[in-house]
Amino acid sequence: MQRYFPLPAALLSLIFSTSPVQAANADTTWLASWTASPQAVWGSDFVLPANVPAVLRGHTVRQVARLSVGGPRVRIVLSHAYGKVPLRIGAATVALAANGSAIEAASLRTLTFAGQPAASMAPGAPLVSDPVDLAVPDLARLTVSVHLPQPSPTATFHWDGRETAWIAPHDRTRAARIDEAQTGVQTTTARLLLSAIEVEAAPGAQAVAILGDSITDGASASLGMDARWPDFLAERLAPQGVAVINAGISGARLLSDGMGENALARFERDVLAQPGVRTVVVLLGINDISWPGTAFAPREQRPTLAELKAGYAQLLAQARSRGVRVIGATVTPFEGALPGTPLSDYYQPEKELLRQQLNAWIRGSGQFDAVLDFDALARDPAHPLRLLPAYDSGDHLHPGDAGNRALAEGIDLPLLLNDQSPRPAYKAVLK
């Protein structure tokens, strides 16, 4: 028979007492303020070029990201999700961004990992930095620099970063700026390794995640201008202390892999596991409908409405098991999409019919906590199957900057809040 012995009172006191560190931690939490969903780097046989070197050899990668909300401390998350071998990080820094590749020198901080300035990333794993004392305001632009001292295959990236990144020889993590004209310096608009930036926040702080495709990822947004529709939404929610994270991937699909894993497979990693997410907006379906039969997926069959509904039902089930609200967004018009390209068959009347059926279900099913009718907001009243010309980037599929702003400004903000009072805006003073 198993016997149980009482513990001495002094030992009980040691076990259940709260240390000063624990007390401090109880007053704060970590909140996702910016994300870029990881993708596997594809080969040269894909329709679109990857636009990254196959191997980095002793290079520094410098990237800029705009936070949604700020805080007194930050930490950085790197991703090696699709790597097959360990990846060595030799040094890493974070700083407030200046112009281009330049940094605000007084803000430069060394990143450490378990107290060490270097680390090894396990295949398939993320790497989270130690917290850094760097007070950052809402909507701050941060520069993250990472040095890879050993030959490193580029297995994980985010293809459409909408920002210039610099790849420079040697350890340039503490450089005031990186000169693009210098021998060996390359640039790309993809993101390498960097997948999230978190800020220290008060308990109960919340984030809104956007799960989407190229319309969310900002395929036609102006480069370096933070002009994707989640960027404009972040500007509206920052004064209330609510973060916005972008889990869009250009070419993303709900049911099938494309230029990234299908949404059902990546939902946990890219949305539900992100700290502070209480609400997710889902804007997906156009690539499920339109990729099959094109150069993107020439041998695939288009899904049925029932299959799309079943996919959405799985997202809803995953989210609600975690207490996360789900906002459905209708799919925007796309008649005449991608003219003069190898994908001119992206739009077809039978695909349009399926889009209409999916939108009718999103609007009327009652399955979502709320609905954002982006179709009604973005369409041309004179030609409802097309984007309003003022919102059209020119490819008849993706909104331009004005269209992205209109989507963000057309949202009734209380729909996104999880019945909690948001905190005031964070205004940092650099020390």
Place the predicted regions along the sequence by residue:
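N-terminal secretory targeting modules
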Residues: Q2, A10, A23-L211, A221-L223, ...
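Bacterial N-terminal signal peptides
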Residues: P8-S17
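Conserved SGNH/GDSL esterase-like catalytic core that processes O-acyl groups on lipids
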Residues: W34, R57-Q63, L78, P86, ...
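Residues that form or immediately flank small-molecule/cofactor binding pockets and catalytic motifs
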Residues: A202, I249, A376-R379
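Catalytic His-Asp segment of secreted/periplasmic serine-dependent ester chemistry enzymes
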Residues: L264, S290, T332-K431
